[in-house]
Amino acid sequence: MPLSSETSEMVKQPIRQNRLHKVLHKNLRIPPWVIRPFYRALKITGSPTQYRLRKRLAGEIVAVTKPGMTIPDRAGYRLFGPDDIEGTDRIVRYCETVYQQSRADFPPEYFQKHPHKKFLFPILEGAEFCRHPELLRFMVSRPILDAAAAYLGTVPKLTGARLCWSPENETARSSQLFHFDYEDLRQVKVFMNIFETKEDQGPLTFLPADISHQVQRAIGRVLGRVPDERIYEGGGRNHEVKLIGPPGSGAFLDTSRCLHYGSRCNRRDRVVLIIQFLNCYSAFRPTAPFTVPSDLPGFEPDLVQKLALGID
């Protein structure tokens, strides 16, 4: 059933103010954690009706979300198994097929352009997911979307997705070191193992949010990549959670609050599906944005899913 003109107006995404964010941060060198609250308030002012709608729907979601699919605020993460989200087995098989096909066709020029990158090669990224409606439908299936909305307190926006392959490597650099993601004060990323993942495959490794906060209080604000020794000095030793498990296992993780790293010193291939949800009023501009068509085959999104996908 088509949306009413009033509801359709609510679903429209607020206008991005990224130029202002660039001036404040890049030119005036105001720290991003100072800019974000101001920037968000400005965007909310420009779209108050949608703001209230997203908050109201999130409140309704909290009331009905199963405890096993909620993300504890203190920990900032929730692990899940292959049977916890309906359709996971089908998506794992689909991603395995895409991976096998992509390995044969992976462009050699990518390695030439990125000679120092040895991990997290994108098999699918951004707009490429629009050619795979089954994956898009899964990414905003209500168990996944509701968990993100309940944690963030608002119906979020699907801001990014990647299917990544990490081959054997012996490196420990960049995102293979402990770090935070800085897109917003809070976010939800979903990491799903496509292959069975063990410790020798460079699994996603992270500290719970409360331990990460404790580490920051001890060593000072973490602004980049940090070696293990420094994290351990701050009390992080023996608190690591490693995302190992069978195909379809994974985690909802607030990577803005949980120190994390992954794909370090793989001995075997690792393939992971990564989905990102941010507050619609975040200052972050996706590096690989994509517009979702409103007529995905076999998919009739509800209002919450329309808001997450940015479908009018």
Feature roles, as predicted:
Residues 154-157, 180-183, 192-203, 208-211:
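Active-site region of the double-stranded beta-helix
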Residues 161-163, 209, 255-257:
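Short, well-ordered beta-to-alpha junction loops that form the rim of enzyme active sites
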Residues 14, 27, 31-176:
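Non-heme Fe(II)-dependent double-stranded beta-helix
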Residues 176-182, 258-262:
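Histidine-centered catalytic micro-motifs
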Residues 183-199, 244-245, 276-279:
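Short, conserved beta-strand element in jelly-roll/cupin
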Residues 2-28, 212-312:
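Conserved double-stranded beta-helix
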